[in-house]
């Protein structure tokens, strides 16, 4: 009985881990994952912290989900975890217009890849001092 349970468990786990695409044909796991040109530092440099958000002491991490197509372009971006609408809008602007991505590759071919990018909004000491936070 233990052997049968173990075989069933191994079979099911191999099916789960072998699924590399979702129902839309977007890859979830690839040999070479999509990447941000310039790394995460490039993301931080592109963020323009909204003045209203600074005055209101808004901070947090916005999670943006999207697909990087085989040409490295962003498609179907959406907020997965929100902090505040004004920060969400800035996060989407950065992802859609400011950052360049390297495409993901599977079996030597560029493929569409689902990606989640956390964008951290944290007030600097200068911003806190300016508005006496």
Give the predicted meaning of each segment.
Residues 5-6, 18-133:
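Charge-biased low-complexity segments
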